[in-house]
Amino acid sequence: MNQTLLSDFGTPVERVERAIDALRNGRGVMVLDDESRENEGDMVFAAEAMTVEQMALTIRHGSGIVCLCITDERRQQLDLPMMVANNSSQFQTAFTVTIEAAKGVTTGVSAADRLTTIRAAIADNAKPTDLNRPGHVFPLRGQPGGVLSRRGHTEASIDLATLAGYKPAGVLCELTNDDGSMAHAPEVIEFAKLHDMPVVTIDDLAEYRQSQEKKAS
């Protein structure tokens, strides 16, 4: 990742700490992966703290595929089968079947409805019957170990939410340009500045976690 582009957002450690602080205060963050991987930026929110306004922003400026990043424990609690038995996607993105809240929604498409679905899925006492399948929210199963196991947006979202003191669940959506193309680092940074969102890279987060674990050992 071009560090010059990211210089306005601080050092790698500062970028992670600012992202954690933003989530802790109910704001969103932009998460970039490596230029040799997807080379995309995702809007990321802590699932527990996301607002309808933030969901509307996500739908308006994103790909439309709003994903709920959850642990495998939560996936099993909700009895969500994986979308396919044999995952042949390039980066092994671990989609489950899509979901909709069983109660409190209309068509399930609106910002409010999608947030209702997310809240139903992350509730402490959530059970499989709280969700209908299919729906308009796309759960993603994170790998145990987070970004230290897989350097994906899914794991970064869960790690950041956890570091901010929330349940291990994040909401993400890929940022797109006005013409429908995918936003890369320059456009992601421009969007982040416009919407007062920190920018952090997955590599930043992995290095931060490795450093924290070394200190703890």
From Swiss-Prot:
One example GO MF annotation: manganese ion binding
Pfam families, alphabetized: DHBP_synthase
Top-rank lineage group of the source organism: Bacteria
UniProt cofactor(s): Mg(2+); Mn(2+)
Any Gene Ontology CC annotation: cytosol
Binding site for Mg(2+) 2: 38, 153
Binding note for cofactor: Binds 2 divalent metal cations per subunit. Magnesium or manganese.
Function: Catalyzes the conversion of D-ribulose 5-phosphate to formate and 3,4-dihydroxy-2-butanone 4-phosphate.
Pathway entry: Cofactor biosynthesis; riboflavin biosynthesis; 2-hydroxy-3-oxobutyl phosphate from D-ribulose 5-phosphate: step 1/1
Family designation: Belongs to the DHBP synthase family.
Protein name: 3,4-dihydroxy-2-butanone 4-phosphate synthase
GO BP term (any one): riboflavin biosynthetic process
Residues holding Mg(2+) 1: 38
Site annotation Essential for catalytic activity: residues: 136, 174
Description of how the protein assembles with itself and partners: Homodimer.
Record EC number: 4.1.99.12
Signal peptide: none
InterPro entries: DHBP_synth_RibB-like_a/b_dom (IPR017945), DHBP_synthase_RibB (IPR000422)
Binding site for D-ribulose 5-phosphate: 37-38, 42, 150-154, 174
Catalytic activity: D-ribulose 5-phosphate = (2S)-2-hydroxy-3-oxobutyl phosphate + formate + H(+)
Species classification: Bacteria, Pseudomonadati, Pseudomonadota, Gammaproteobacteria, Enterobacterales
Gene giving rise to this polypeptide: ribB
Entry keywords, A to Z: Lyase, Magnesium, Manganese, Metal-binding, Riboflavin biosynthesis
